[in-house]
Amino acid sequence: MTMYIDNSKLKVHISLWLGSMFWLISIMIIVGGLTRLTDSGLSITKWQLFSGILPPLNENDWVQYFNLYKEIPEFKLQNYSMTMNEFKIIFWWEWIHRFLGRLIGLAYLIPLIYFSFKIKFKYLINLYLIFFLICFQG
């Protein structure tokens, strides 16, 4: 994607922004792969965009999350003998993966809003398309 922007300082800022997005997404791919390899993908059974950002903070929270996990088929059919400590390991992989997703969304959206006032509209279409694709990742 080539953008012709007059201000060289703005070009540097956009390059740094998109370069940092590249690295965040690269980290996300690695963490996502490790999440799959450890079968951690279903350890958090509810997707709570805002309230789910905090991990369990005490033993009672851990018990609640573990009890929710015990209700899904993955636990009943495959991990029925899993202990709390084993659950915590897979939980953390999934939590980091989801946290990175939120971080990537914000790290893209906030500069996008700022640059929306600095860049010509015809160049913004591609940047907003990328944001749309980020939002609809599964």
Residue spans of the language-model regions?
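Individual transmembrane alpha-helix segments
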Residues: L68-Y108
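Short, Lys/Arg-rich, polar N-terminal cytosolic tail immediately upstream
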Residues: M1-L10
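N-terminal signal-anchor transmembrane alpha helix
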Residues: H13-G52
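Structural signal for the C-terminal ends of transmembrane alpha-helices
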Residues: I113-I119
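Lipid-exposed faces of alpha-helical membrane segments in multi-pass integral membrane proteins
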Residues: S20-I27, V31, L103-I113, L129-F136
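Histidine-/acidic- and/or cysteine-rich, low-complexity loops and terminal segments associated
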Residues: R36-M84
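Membrane-interfacial loop-to-transmembrane alpha-helix junctions, especially the N-terminal start
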Residues: I14-L18, F121-F131
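Aromatic/pi-system hotspot detector in well-structured domains
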Residues: G32, W93, H97, Q137
